Amino acid sequence: MPQQIEFVPQEPTRWLVPKLLVLIGVQVALSTKFAEFFDRRDAHTGVLAARLPDGSQAGVDQVGGDRWSLVETVGGYDFTGAEELWLDYVSDSGDGFDATTTIAALVARESLTLPGPRGEHFTRAGAILVLGGDQAYPFATMEEYRNRLVGPFRSTLPWTWHPRWLFAIPGNHDWYDGLASFVKQFCQGRWIGGWKTCQTRSYFALALPHNWHLWAVDVALATDIDTGQLDYFEERARALEPGAQIVLCAAKPTWTAARQDPTAHDVLEYFQRTVIGARAELRLTLAGDLHFYARYRTADGESKIVAGGGGAYLSPTHHLPTPVRPPTPELSEAVPEEQPKAFGLERVFPATGESRRLRRRIFGQIYHNRGFFVVTAAVYGLVAMAVPADRVFDRPTGRWLEAVAALLPVTLTALGLFAALYAFTAGSQASPGRKRAVAALHTILHLGVVIGVVDLLLHISGVAAADPWMRAVLGGAVGALLGPLMVAVYLWIADHWQVNSNELYAACANESYKNFLRLRVNRDGLTVYPVGVRLPVRWRFDQNLPGTAPTDSQERGEWASKPWFRPTQDIRPEIIEDPIHIPPKRPHGHPASSSSACPG
């Protein structure tokens, strides 16, 4: 592969690799603590974007003749001049090369015809690409962006006669370096192949045709919207015309966590209530972070879609709550008779049965996390040293103090192991009692194996068993072989209790069931086409690419636009469900028809 492509294709992230676990822990701790003293978004508050007078259009002639400059008006980046506009939404994309490139290749195509149960659906490439967060894994650096996002997207659309615009919001993985790399990559006017970035902040507003608006907020690490960002959107909210329709993008689908954490949705609810308020109708909310497709809908047609299938490992769909009622803390004071909306789960991809079946992959995939066996070997060796070298309860009656003293080291070690394994459940949205129960089970699984090994050694050679280093060596060897399997057994069982499900599926690193959204805005409203790919394809560098650019301008353009990689087999995109049509609501009235799936 030539060095001119300027990036190195990456394998999917293996989340249980010890070195990576340490690095992520350090990054999370530093970024969280650093954010308490300095929020990089505060620096964006003073950034003055070039603006046109209210109501004017950002066009070629108005931007100093620079064809690829986009001016931000008081209503946002202005795309209102088109009668019809297509957009693409991709989230959680920057992971393994094959999966990311598969999605990038579909987004790059000028058109897609999607087969569905009711026939085919023709779609056009988005003039705008919105990236919904987590553009690089495991954490953002310029190198990771180059290898895991820029390279794959640029290789599928190196150049085009009709360049497109790209906007992005950061997810938690983009925030792990304090947003420094994100600002460099997306807020400095860089090109990513045929896509041009133009935003100056980590959040943005797009003014779309027919009084539709796409607002994308940056909720940082702690689901927080800073005051400068609130002022930015408040200014745009005041410029809205009557009958405005809002599509809201956020990096986290907070509504899915509302049952376990009643405060999870507070920030987005506050934004909706105070910034959007009665000035506009919130019709659709988009989020990533969870790596699947899931659509929620209320009786009045408002929809919330999770579409985090841009390239990262598959997340489980079988634990999604339904219905969800995102709590509104101050609603009872403002409008006592009004109750929170109920959002019912309409469709998931993959189906819940398939999601459950895929968790069995953990028993083989656990061993693909290189170096993880070192962790289990070290733990087993330490526990084996603490296990008594004889059968404590076979000692003569009356020597109970000796028995207690013999059991003290292994007891303390077991308590330490339990504490560590309980901390391992911290990211799960389960009750503390359930977490303690599964942590105890996890501890018992490992202790049972180690005690069994020491007991076997006692049967073979009491002299060898008396040597703590001999026990440590044997325990470490068994830990390397069986320790990962015991972790896999634990993760499989814990998922049934909705604990450590994310860790289970992250360890599987399953690249199947990718997805993205294609949106069309026209006079009839907004139509969402959810695009799915059950299996990403493998890619090989195209050795037949001509190395010298032709002199003719037309031929040079065709030469520059050729993809650098070829798939080893055809990509098979499909429509996950019938297109979701959201008609516009009339000011102070009702929609012409409710949000529904349409045949195309």
PLM feature spans:
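Acidic, histidine-bearing metal-coordination/catalytic regions of metal-dependent phosphoesterases
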Residues: 1-130, 136-170, 176-210, 326-600
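Active-site-proximal beta-strand elements of phosphoester/diester hydrolases
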Residues: 84-95, 211-221, 247-251, 302-310, ...
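Active-site neighborhood of phospho(di)ester-bond hydrolases with catalytic His/Asp-centered motifs
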Residues: 90-91, 128-134, 162-172, 217, ...
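Active-site environment of divalent metal-dependent phosphoester hydrolases
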Residues: 96-98, 137-140, 170-179, 222-225, ...
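Active-site-proximal segments of metal-dependent phosphoesterases and phosphodiesterases across multiple
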Residues: 98, 227-229, 241-283, 366-370
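Conserved beta-sheet core of the metallophosphoesterase superfamily
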Residues: 168, 263-328, 481-514
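Preference for well-ordered, secondary-structure-rich cores of eukaryotic proteins
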Residues: 187-191, 201-204, 209, 217, ...
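Membrane-proximal envelope and lipid/glycan-remodeling enzymes
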Residues: 245-247, 257-262, 270-271, 303-305, ...
